[in-house]
A protein has these predicted regions:
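Sec-dependent bacterial lipoprotein signal peptides
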Residues: 1-19
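Low-complexity, acidic/polar, glycine-enriched regions of mature
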Residues: 21-223
Length: 223
């Protein structure tokens, strides 16, 4: 009975892990940085409402994960006839929050991610050297499935790459809400290498997935 129980438990665990892999968000198309979009019309200016804008994140290990948020520091868009023609926003990397832990465990992980722990500054985001990240729009387009695709240069930890992600945009003349579908980026493309099995070959099962899942919500009001 014990053997059978162990066998079925193992099968169940593999099944759950398989479902988890299948549910993983799609990786953003990533390429070299591109020319930033410039509005060619007299569009309307919108300013990002930082109190209602955020980036949600998830990080994964083989048997667990953590999640939290990062705040938007400032940003603006230029909109013409309901279309965002150009824009950017700045991400406050000092605002990294872990939402699935409490007390010392929460504080310890937040400090490690931000790089405020002596000797571990460069493990993740090193906010003392790189206190902000930026996203600058380069293009809006339509995918083969009809979804709106947003492309932009993500400058993170001093490394700039262009990413393309599916988004939903709602505009009513006074307010614009831009919300991405969940997507992942390969953190090593921005030199966030700590615990990466693709960078270090001696980690065994003690590694952190390269993929970080993100979901962006930007709320902007007419300036």
């Amino acid at each position: 009975m014990n053997f059978n129980l162990a066998k079925y438990t193992a099968i169940a665990a593999v099944t759950i892990m398989s479902f988890s892999c299948n549910d993983k968000a799609k990786e953003a198309e990533t390429s070299e940085a591109e020319t930033v979009a410039v509005s060619e019309t007299t569009g309307i200016d919108f300013t990002v409402d930082t109190t209602s804008s955020k980036i949600e994140w998830k990080g994964f290990k083989p048997t667990s994960h953590h999640f939290g948020t990062v705040s938007i520091d400032e940003g603006s868009f230029k909109v013409n006839n309901g279309t965002i023609e150009s824009g950017m926003f700045i991400i406050d990397m000092n605002s990294i929050a872990v939402n699935d832990l409490e007390g010392n465990r929460k504080a310890n992980l937040e400090n490690h991610l931000m790089g405020t722990v002596e000797g571990k500054e460069g493990d993740f985001f090193n906010v003392r050297e790189y206190p902000t990240a930026t996203f600058e729009i380069t293009e809006f387009s339509k995918g083969d499935d009809g979804k709106t695709l947003l492309s932009g240069n993500l400058n993170l930890k001093g490394k700039k790459n262009n990413i393309t992600i599916p988004v939903n945009i709602n505009e009513n003349g006074e307010n614009v809400v831009l919300e991405s579908e969940p997507f992942t980026i390969d953190r090593t493309k921005w030199d966030v290498n700590f615990g990466s099995k693709s960078i270090f070959d001696n980690l065994g099962d003690n590694f952190i997935n390269d993929d970080i899942e993100l979901k962006i919500t930007i709320n902007a009001n007419k300036a």
